[in-house]
């Protein structure tokens, strides 16, 4: 990803943190990350995040999914004597569309998922507070 695109994603994420009334320190604003999960399609598959804590057992993050971005289902499996991690999502602003294993449960999914190796289409919709 080009540096200009990376910086644009960060700028958009900071706008959404502000809209959602999530207060970040100056240091946290400087440390916003952009993840494209190795797909190179950050506008479709990716997210922006601030990491508060990241240890072998615990991770605390605030994430922004921009309109039409989706976070692919993934796992943090045990490795190198680490027991792995579980993740959970809580929507603070807007709507979040997650796609997980299971029977396809809607006629047409809400996300714009590009042709890729994504194989799960069971849609979970999160609204603020969920």
Put a short name on every predicted segment:
Residues 6, 16, 52, 68, ...:
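Sequence-level detector for tyrosine residue identity
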Residues 1-59, 109, 113-114:
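A short, N-terminal "cap"/entry segment at the start of jelly-roll beta-barrel domains
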Residues 35-37, 43, 65, 91, ...:
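Generic detector of intrinsically disordered, low-complexity, polar/charged segments
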Residues 66-70, 128-130:
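Tight coil/turn sites that cap or link beta-strands
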Residues 88-90, 102-130:
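Short acidic-glycine-tyrosine-enriched beta hairpin
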Residues 48-60, 74-91, 119-120:
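A short beta-loop-beta micro-motif enriched in histidine and acidic residues
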Residues 66-67, 84-104:
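Glycine- and acidic-residue-biased ligand/ion/polar-headgroup-sensing regions
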Residues 62, 75, 100-102:
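Residue-level recognition of conserved beta-strand positions in structured domain cores
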């Amino acid at each position: 990803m080009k540096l200009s695109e990376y910086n644009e994603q960060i700028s958009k994420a900071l706008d959404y943190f502000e809209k959602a009334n999530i207060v970040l320190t100056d240091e946290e604003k400087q440390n916003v990350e952009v993840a494209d999960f190795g797909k190179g399609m950050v506008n479709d598959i990716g997210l922006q995040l601030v990491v508060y804590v990241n240890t072998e057992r615990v991770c605390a993050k605030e994430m922004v999914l921009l309109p039409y971005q989706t976070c692919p289902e993934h796992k943090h499996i045990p490795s190198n004597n680490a027991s792995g991690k579980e993740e959970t999502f809580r929507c603070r602003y807007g709507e979040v569309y997650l796609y997980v294993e299971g029977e396809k449960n809607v006629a047409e999914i809400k996300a714009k998922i590009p042709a890729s190796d994504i194989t799960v289409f069971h849609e979970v919709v999160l609204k603020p507070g969920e």
